[in-house]
């Protein structure tokens, strides 16, 4: 079987097995063990990614993006579809998948994150299969293991978002493309087109991998001179055309979802930040680049193909982001990490098996510190890691534990509605209060809410226009605001504060937790 114009045995011959004498080197037990492991090259990376994904996956608190996923996926299907008309259309497929998952396994952090862990483990298997397809068993095994060891892979395996499924589908699309280029038959091209369509409905930005596929397909056509490979063009067009409805819906919602992303600059500083944040480790990123360079010395054709997959999507998104909306943020291009791992795997396949094993171990050691940091309780609130950390996060679980320990039947609660609804303090407290409240004591009623987000089909609830009319006879009201606040009125609007004062509520308790302040207001007799 040929691999991008080479016979697989040619690539194997590139490894230093004969010491330059032409006489095969003596095989050792370690070589036999390495070959056995290589034949199962897809299995071991999947297992490693699964173990790393499950390890301490419940320790980090849910952060606002995960809480948004929980909010949408917890709605009835009819409400979820209606909500997509206003926001979250591009994530609708993931929300529907998560909705079904929650119906079976529940909505604990561990349960919801397990879906992403399984997707990332499957992605590791696909990375190994792509590496094996290109450069043989050992390259596949090394590619998959390196991928599983990248800290950002574990980080987003533990994220209740669409990133891990997108990485899986994108890597599967690359594998299907390689199979179609090897044997350009209509069924194989249709499978590739269907996978692209699925990718678009999983994550529109992940379709940037098609830029890499175009470059790779051109290279293969140049190598092989097989005109049947031109069927790539209609296959890709079919897959992309199927995504037009979701692209149109997403474009109308872009300002509300990604308006915070700055237009990227062409500076080295900007790209250095991008690289560090893409891998969640400066040292691992450096190691992968070094190993990627080594790949060019053993199989430059395969290296060129995969380098296109690693770089072309980034360039494409950078160019698109010069327009009205910017999509240039590292986690949106997580789909390129697999390509860097495959380059590293091809480079490692040139080395003696023992040296390659040591190199993989070095990658693990280099990323060990980052692997621990991304499992800290507040780690998911550090989207710019390894830049911008320092312990800051919103301790929703701590605030909920405090409220639940002091709560009484009939209490009301007000979440910060002033200036920063995107902090999702309400979602965070509601999620953890539902798990912490004592038996027989209901979760405090959310005051000043005219419609819940599910009822309104929006991301945020609709506030009462006349707050005084929304107050009941609650003898006590909890107010939860962001940061270290001195007064509950810093967290509420002027109209809400006026309504509370008119009912003669006085502050009787203040509790500061990480990132939040909890006030208890008691009505004067």
Please provide the spans of the model-predicted regions.
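Short, intrinsically disordered terminal tails adjacent to the first/last structured region
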Residues: 1-35, 362-366, 525
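Membrane-proximal helix-loop-helix interfaces that form the catalytic/acceptor-binding platform
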Residues: 3, 30, 37-524
